[in-house]
């Protein structure tokens, strides 16, 4: 309950350590990680395949393929949001190179931008074309429009994935 409270009412970030991942097989670790996550909130998939757990590892996927997710490549991830209230990361082994994770508060970014460039901050509340990355439901367009920021009861919520915004431009009818 303390972790959940800190995520919702505190800084929005909690670092936990001490799980000896070398002691367990991958399936057991995955089960423990998902069980812990379910104590914080409802598990939800992040892709059309319904995966509740994604492995951030280079599987040799082509970064230029619109269906590729950046975490399947050896490319550096840029700042982005996942479409959930909370995200969990579990490190199973240290990367040979890179692998650094950084986090930033959407509220803090919005507040800073509103102070320094209010006209740009306002534009983030306007819908922008975003690529579905070949994961659209039947009968839906391969892109959708959504604002980067939306007002919420306690600030703003964000949905931002620059690669998806850029790749939406491959569709002639996307604004």
Which stretches of residues belong to each language-model region?
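Active-site environment of non-heme Fe oxygenases that use a 2-His-1-carboxylate facial triad
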Residues: 1-2, 9, 14, 21-23, ...
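"Short basic amphipathic alpha-helical interaction patches in structured regions
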Residues: 27-34, 103-105
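A short alpha->loop->secondary-structure connector
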Residues: 33-44
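Structured, acidic catalytic/metal-binding patches in enzyme active sites
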Residues: 48
């Amino acid at each position: 309950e303390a972790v959940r409270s800190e995520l919702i009412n505190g800084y929005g970030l909690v670092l936990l350590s001490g799980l000896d991942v070398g002691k367990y097989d991958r399936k057991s670790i995955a089960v423990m990680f998902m069980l812990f996550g379910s104590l914080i909130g409802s598990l939800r998939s992040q892709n059309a395949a319904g995966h509740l757990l994604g492995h951030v590892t280079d599987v040799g996927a082509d970064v230029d393929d619109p269906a590729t997710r950046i975490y399947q490549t050896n490319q550096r991830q840029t700042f982005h949001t996942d479409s959930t209230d909370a995200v969990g990361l579990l490190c199973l082994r240290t990367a040979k190179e890179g692998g650094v994770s950084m986090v930033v508060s959407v509220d803090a970014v919005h507040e800073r931008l509103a102070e320094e460039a209010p006209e740009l901050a306002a534009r983030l509340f306007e819908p922008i074309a975003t690529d579905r990355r070949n994961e659209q439901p039947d009968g839906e367009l391969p892109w959708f429009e959504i604002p980067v920021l939306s007002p919420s009861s306690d600030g703003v919520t964000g949905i931002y994935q620059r690669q998806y915004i850029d790749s939406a431009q491959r569709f002639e009818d996307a604004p």
